[in-house]
């Protein structure tokens, strides 16, 4: 049997790794940001402490109830990034990852074709991107005040709740910190930026301008007039009117009969005088 390792390196490149290609993958086939890096470029920093993006976790391994939100301050208490802290920029429920401002940062070269405005030097710009940190490696920082009244941030633990609306903290007893001032405020949601007006968008003055006023002399008729006409000229109202009129007529006839019967009874009961039939 022929050894395939002697044939594949001619197409794949030197070495015994069959999956290592001689040429890098095209940009549209790359799946990780770090594949855009050129290690030979001195302008790109290679921070060994920075970790790549976290993999997608299974649904059973994902955090069911999140208690860390965008805008909170967190502290990395374990892992290679232990000791760093910052503000939460983004959360990812699929990877259980938290993006912290200024933590786990890596410099990445961005291709020009991905930018709307090309740079003047026609070179790929290098930007710093913060990568994710696992949810289990961080701890929330609560607001507190020292004995001198200065604001500080201290790491706290949370009580377990089966809801994201409840965030009860366990207040630690730290020397020099007023324990009654320890609190964990809910971060304020940032207002979403308004979309810029486009060239084909209808302006507000045009939308609010009154271009039609209802009139009874010109079509179309206003809604209230149509409703009145429909109510007054409907067949259902004609039937109701006839039914009421018949009831009224029957009532009047019954009253007349009662009056006639009463008058007849009174006439019968009335005594007859002797002069009534006199000649």
Curated annotation (Swiss-Prot):
Q: Which SMART domains match?
A: KOW
The identity of this protein, by name, is Large ribosomal subunit protein uL24m
| Keywords, in A-Z order | Mitochondrion, Ribonucleoprotein, Ribosomal protein, Transit peptide
All residue ranges annotated as the KOW domain in the record: 70-100
For molecular function, the Gene Ontology terms on record are:
RNA binding; structural constituent of ribosome
Q: Where in the cell is it found?
A: Mitochondrion
State what this protein does. Component of the mitochondrial ribosome (mitoribosome), a dedicated translation machinery responsible for the synthesis of mitochondrial genome-encoded proteins, including at least some of the essential transmembrane subunits of the mitochondrial respiratory chain. The mitoribosomes are attached to the mitochondrial inner membrane and translation products are cotranslationally integrated into the membrane.
- Gene name, per UniProt, is mrpl40
Q: Which SUPFAM superfamilies match?
A: Translation proteins SH3-like domain (SSF50104)
User: Looking at the keywords, is Transferase present?
Assistant: no
Q: Name one GO biological process term.
A: translation
Transit peptide start-stop: 1-31
Q: Where is this region: Disordered?
A: 34-56, 185-204
Could you name the Gene Ontology cellular component terms for this entry? mitochondrial large ribosomal subunit; mitochondrion
- Name the Pfam families for this protein: Ribosomal_uL24m-like
> What spans are recorded as compositionally biased (Basic and acidic residues)?
34-51, 187-202
Q: Has the keyword Ribosomal protein been applied to this entry?
A: yes
Looking up InterPro entries in the UniProt record yields:
KOW, Rib_uL2_dom2, Ribosomal_uL24, Ribosomal_uL24_KOW, Translation_prot_SH3-like_sf
Quaternary context? Component of the mitochondrial large ribosomal subunit (mt-LSU). Mature yeast 74S mitochondrial ribosomes consist of a small (37S) and a large (54S) subunit. The 37S small subunit contains a 15S ribosomal RNA (15S mt-rRNA) and at least 32 different proteins. The 54S large subunit contains a 21S rRNA (21S mt-rRNA) and at least 45 different proteins. uL24m forms the wall of the exit tunnel.
Q: Which family does it belong to?
A: Belongs to the universal ribosomal protein uL24 family.
């Amino acid at each position: 049997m022929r050894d395939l390792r002697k044939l594949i390196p001619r197409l794949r490149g030197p070495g015994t790794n069959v999956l290592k290609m001689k040429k890098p993958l095209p940009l549209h086939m790359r799946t990780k940001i770090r594949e855009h890096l050129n290690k030979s470029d001195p302008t790109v920093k290679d921070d060994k402490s920075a970790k790549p993006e976290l993999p997608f976790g299974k649904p059973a391994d994902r955090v069911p109830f999140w208690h860390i939100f965008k805008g909170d301050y967190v502290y990395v208490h374990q892992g290679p990034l232990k000791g760093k802290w910052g503000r939460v920029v983004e959360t990812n429920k699929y990877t259980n990852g938290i993006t912290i401002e200024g933590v786990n940062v890596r410099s990445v070269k961005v291709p020009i074709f991905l930018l709307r405005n090309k740079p003047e030097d026609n070179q790929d710009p290098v930007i710093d991107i913060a990568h994710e940190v696992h949810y289990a490696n961080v701890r929330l920082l609560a607001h507190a005040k020292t004995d001198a009244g200065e604001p500080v941030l201290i790491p706290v633990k949370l009580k377990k709740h089966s809801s994201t609306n409840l965030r009860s903290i366990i207040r630690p007893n730290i020397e020099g910190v007023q324990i009654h001032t320890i609190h964990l405020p809910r971060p304020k949601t940032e207002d979403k930026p308004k979309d810029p007006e486009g060239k084909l968008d209808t302006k507000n003055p045009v939308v609010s301008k009154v271009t039609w006023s209802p009139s009874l002399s010109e079509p179309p008729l206003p809604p209230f007039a149509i409703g009145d006409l429909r109510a007054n000229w409907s067949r259902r109202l004609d039937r109701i009117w006839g039914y009421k009129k018949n009831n009224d007529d029957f009532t009047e006839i019954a009253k007349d009969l009662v009056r006639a019967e009463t008058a007849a009874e009174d006439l019968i009961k009335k005594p007859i005088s002797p002069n009534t039939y006199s000649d």
